[in-house]
From Swiss-Prot:
Recorded GO CC terms: cytoplasm
Gene3D superfamilies per UniProt: Putative methyltransferase TM0872, insert domain, Vaccinia Virus protein VP39
EC code(s) of this entry: 2.1.1.199
Protein name as annotated: Ribosomal RNA small subunit methyltransferase H
Entry's localization field: Cytoplasm
Claim: Nucleus is one of the keywords in the record: no
Reaction(s) this enzyme catalyzes, per UniProt: cytidine(1402) in 16S rRNA + S-adenosyl-L-methionine = N(4)-methylcytidine(1402) in 16S rRNA + S-adenosyl-L-homocysteine + H(+)
Organism: Acidithiobacillus ferrooxidans (strain ATCC 23270 / DSM 14882 / CIP 104768 / NCIMB 8455) (Ferrobacillus ferrooxidans (strain ATCC 23270))
Keywords from the named record: Cytoplasm, Methyltransferase, rRNA processing, S-adenosyl-L-methionine, Transferase
Species classification: Bacteria, Pseudomonadati, Pseudomonadota, Acidithiobacillia, Acidithiobacillales
Family indicated by similarity: Belongs to the methyltransferase superfamily. RsmH family.
Recorded GO MF terms: rRNA (cytosine-N4-)-methyltransferase activity
Gene Ontology BP, a term: rRNA base methylation
Basic and acidic residues bias (residue ranges): 295-304, 312-321
Region entry Disordered, spans: 286-321
Amino acid sequence: MRSANEPDATHVAVLLAETIVALRPALHTGAAVRCVDATGGRGGHSAALLAELGAADTLLILDRDPSAIAALRARFAQDSRVYIRQARFSQLAEVLAALEWERVDAILADLGVSSPQLDEAARGFSFLRDGPLDMRMDPGADRSAAEWLATATEADMTRVLREYGEERFARPIARAILRAREQAPITRTLQLAELIAQVLPRHETGQHPATRSFQGIRIFINRELEELEAFLPQAMNALRAGGRLAVISFHSLEDRLVKRFFRADDYRISADVPLRASELPPLPWHPAGKALRAGPRETRDNPRSRSAVLRVAERSERHAA
């Protein structure tokens, strides 16, 4: 059995040192600390958090993927500080209530698809490996990508590919899918990837032609942006005064949501309101430092870290009572 300090060779935690450094001010308070890893994956960030925590501290680990839960339970079976729950991170408030945890000190969410999910063809996330066109992070949830593609309208497919995949050729791809499924069901990852490659212009280089489309379908199938929008306020409301939330995002749609939320734009008063700065109410939280990206060494050793962005926010004193 792998120990909690032993890394999982199939998955490398992104921005690991930077995340721990950013959360460290919330982890050493002189009292018993409670932390949450809202996206446990294979436990890389969790293990680093546990190495930072003391014997009286506790860590709650969440993941929606049952295979990740099994791996986490095996990895941390001998650590009594760890609580593991299979849940979406949008269920954070519900899980904390069940544990009777009123406040926590630090929360981490790594929004990326884990390497085991990408590398295991049977999960249906990869356009490089042939497998069933599934893409569900929780295989028992709702419909698969193949089931959606079998009935989606051209308008729906175009919207998903354009909004979630930021695909410029969304409509031609949607039309090609409609034509292809009239001949045979689209049920395999390489079947869809090859279809998309035939549609995109040959001069489109720099990444696999199916990258954006697969991203868009995956985000839609797993309701990833809706999950994130539900998670962020729950996480911030769960923090004690001075507690910190760290979020690692991997594409611009996620990062824009996180950036806007961390800036507390919904709580800001218009500059047209005639109030002095001293009269303005304090914001409920504020960004803690600048956004961080992986350095040259990490991007060389782990190419999947190239698009990662770490943002951290701290709960304000007057709003965490």
